[in-house]
Each structure stands twice: as structure tokens, then as C-alpha cells.
């Protein structure tokens, strides 16, 4: 006789899809730092029950993307709830210290191994900029750097780097709100790719170091600027379409 297992009340895949939709919204800046999150509103906008939303929010809290909100209301009706966790320039600088070390190493190794970076990676990034599609810009950025990690020939580099990318992509979502920072990113990527394709490891390493330094500085400055304009957590919840779960 087979073992009796409890029925799953909610599909793990659905909770994961909700998690990814919310993470994308946080990364793209649709859900802003300090913004309060309510299960009811999110569930209604995504056309799902509250349970997968609850599970997704628990994961987002564990991963550091959301946190307990300040208590509001009187003693009788006070409510804590959740809010999007804030970002700060000091924190992102620390993340970039780690990312820079990994990216510089990966780039040097990729160039020394005769790697050819697919020009479509650059074209995709520039196309995303033209479409004003922040999510696509972030995805293209990750694809470019992942190509370098894999070309390095050391799987530990990719494994280590990708641990930080969920937080990096969120910081990118903040920084890319400024259109002035978008094209220069891909100019730097293209220069790095050209150096790698030429097999010039020293130049590729130098360009990647400069790229990481620029990214850290620009993101920190943009986050400080954005933080000044963030309300006290009462901003309206953006519209998230249920159809996003089907992509």
C-alpha cells in the first residue's frame, strides 16, 4: 500500500511564479522601497488566492527583499504588515566589492581562453534601452555577465556570482530609473566584449574593473536620490497583471 501523503493546497509552482512576479516588480522599481504590501491587493491584482501570495512574501522576506513595516494605527487597531525593504549606497557598495572581484577574475580568464562574446548579447541590451524596458535591461545585463562567468571555465565563479544577482538586479532597477545611466552601461559592455574577443586579458580586466566601479558609484548615487523622494510607505500599490504569471 502506498504512503498517504497530504494534499498540497497550493501549487509550489504558482507560489514561485508569484515570487518571481513580485521580485521583478521590486527589481524594476514598480514596487518601491518602503512601500507597504498587502496580501489582499496583491492577490486581487494577480488573480490568485492569498495563499501563494503569503508563501511568496515569506520567501521575499527571508531573502531580504521585504521586511516588517513600522506599526501604524492606535493601540486597538494597530497593524504592522510588510513593506519593500530599503536599499542604501553603503550596502550596494559592499555587494559590488564582491561582484567586482568575481567579474574581474571571470573577464580575465574568459579573454585568456580565446572566448568570443556573442554580439547579440550587446544588441539585446541596446534594444531593451530603446524600448525603455527596465526588466529586459536587467535580464540582458545578467545574460552578458553570465556569459563571461561561463566562459571563464570555472563553475565556482558563476555559482558565487549568481548568489548576489538577485540583490544586484534590484539595485539596478533603482539606478535604471535614470535614463542617463542606460546607454553608458552598454557602451562599457561592448568595450569589454571587444577586449575579450581580441584576447587582451589585461585590457578586458581593466575595463571590467572600471565598469564595476562606475556601476557601484552610479547606483549608490541614484539610490540616495530615489530615497529622498520615497513617501512614508503610503504610496499606492502598482497594478500587477495576472497574465504575468503565464509568461
Q: What are the residue ranges of the model-derived segments?
A:
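Short linear motifs at protein or domain termini
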Residues: 1-112, 224-247
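Short, conserved alpha-helical segments within structured domains
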Residues: 38, 140-141, 164, 208-211
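Hydrophobic alpha-helical segments that form the core
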Residues: 101, 163-169, 212
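Hydrophobic recognition helices of helix-based DNA-binding modules
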Residues: 22, 64, 106, 110, ...
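C-terminal all-alpha effector/ligand-binding and dimerization domain
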Residues: 121-127, 173-247
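Short, charge-rich, low-complexity alpha-helical interaction segments
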Residues: 150, 157-163
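Short alpha-helical transmembrane interface motifs in multi-pass membrane proteins
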Residues: 88-89, 171-175
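All-alpha effector-binding/dimerization core of bacterial HTH-type transcriptional repressors
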Residues: 2, 78-79, 85-152, 180, ...
Amino acid at each position: 500500500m502506498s504512503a498517504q501523503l497530504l494534499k498540497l493546497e497550493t501549487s509550489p509552482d504558482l507560489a514561485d511564479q508569484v515570487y518571481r512576479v513580485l521580485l521583478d516588480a521590486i527589481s524594476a522599481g514598480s514596487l518601491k522601497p518602503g512601500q507597504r504590501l498587502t496580501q489582499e491587493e496583491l492577490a486581487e491584482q494577480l488573480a490568485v488566492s492569498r495563499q501563494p501570495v503569503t508563501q511568496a512574501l515569506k520567501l521575499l522576506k527571508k531573502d531580504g527583499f521585504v521586511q516588517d513595516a513600522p506599526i501604524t494605527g492606535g493601540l486597538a487597531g494597530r497593524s504592522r504588515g510588510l513593506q519593500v525593504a530599503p536599499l542604501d549606497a553603503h550596502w550596494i557598495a559592499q555587494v559590488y566589492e564582491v561582484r567586482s572581484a568575481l567579474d574581474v577574475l571571470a573577464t580575465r580568464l574568459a579573454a585568456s581562453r580565446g572566448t568570443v562574446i556573442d554580439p547579440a548579447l550587446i544588441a539585446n541590451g541596446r534594444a531593451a534601452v530603446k524600448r525603455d524596458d527596465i526588466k529586459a535591461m536587467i535580464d540582458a545585463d545578467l545574460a552578458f555577465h553570465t556569459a563571461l562567468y561561463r566562459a571563464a571555465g570555472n563553475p565556482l565563479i558563476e555559482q558565487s556570482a549568481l548568489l548576489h544577482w538577485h540583490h544586484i538586479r534590484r539595485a539596478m532597477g533603482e539606478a535604471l530609473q535614470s535614463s542617463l545611466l542606460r546607454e553608458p552601461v552598454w557602451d562599457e559592455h561592448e568595450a569589454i566584449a571587444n577586449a575579450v574577443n581580441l584576447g587582451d586579458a589585461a585590457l578586458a580586466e581593466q575595463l571590467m574593473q572600471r565598469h564595476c566601479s562606475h556601476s557601484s558609484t552610479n547606483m549608490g548615487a541614484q539610490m540616495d536620490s530615489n530615497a529622498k523622494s520615497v513617501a512614508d510607505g503610503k504610496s499606492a500599490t502598482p497594478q500587477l497583471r495576472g497574465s504575468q504569471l503565464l509568461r
